[in-house]
């Protein structure tokens, strides 16, 4: 159950409420039981920035904690590439997506929750498209846990799966990329690299704000 435009904790909890109304969620001996797989989807720049805090609050909720126990402490999170690009532009969107994945992954590990990040990518570059294997290799080390999921948009289905040979090659590249990132050891300069990118984005933000003031 993907919750588009998740803005708050209540957006997630209301799914359990609706499930209870329609018999999809039950309580047995004080424990919540459901086949629903609740997947909050964060799409705007503001939501990507607030997602770690919202998830942290959600994990402290007793009802949701019972849901996680029912799912063997597993949580799936979806990130929207298309809307975040439309909202903040290519650079800001990718910066926010990268930071969000790092913080969410650290939060999951801290709370002993197994997780999978679902990448809602489009077909074009501006919508998060591109080669899947390179996209996997570029993900932060923190979220490389062997679990991954991503969308295949209609416009690229024929291109990637139109022939058995190309489809096989595409899947081989995905599996290869996954194996590479799982074997790759943590590098000490990863955090310094992230800090460097953060400084660049802050400088760009300052320049943008200064330009807005001059125009006004």
Name every feature range the model reports, one short phrase each:
Residues 206-216:
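Single conserved hydrophobic/aromatic residue that forms the stacking wall/gate
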């Amino acid at each position: 159950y993907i919750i588009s435009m998740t803005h708050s904790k209540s957006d997630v909890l209301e799914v359990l409420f609706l499930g209870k109304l329609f018999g999809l969620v039950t309580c047995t001996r004080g424990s919540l039981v459901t086949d629903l797989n609740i997947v909050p989807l964060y799409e705007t720049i503001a939501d990507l920035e607030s997602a770690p805090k919202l998830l942290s609050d959600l994990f402290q909720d007793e009802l949701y904690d019972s849901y996680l126990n029912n799912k063997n402490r597993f949580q799936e999170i979806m990130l929207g590439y298309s809307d975040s690009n439309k909202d903040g532009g290519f650079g800001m969107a990718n910066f926010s997506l990268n930071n969000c994945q790092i913080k969410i992954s650290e939060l999951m590990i801290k709370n002993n929750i197994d997780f999978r990040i679902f990448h809602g990518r489009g077909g074009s570059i501006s919508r998060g498209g591109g080669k899947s294997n390179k996209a996997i290799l570029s993900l932060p080390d923190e979220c490389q846990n062997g679990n991954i999921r991503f969308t295949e948009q209609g416009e690229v289905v024929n291109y990637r799966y139109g022939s058995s040979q190309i489809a096989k090659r595409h899947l081989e590249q995905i599996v290869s990329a996954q194996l590479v990132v799982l074997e790759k050891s943590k590098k000490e300069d990863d955090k310094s690299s992230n800090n460097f990118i953060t400084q660049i984005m802050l400088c760009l933000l300052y320049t943008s704000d200064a330009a807005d003031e001059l125009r006004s």
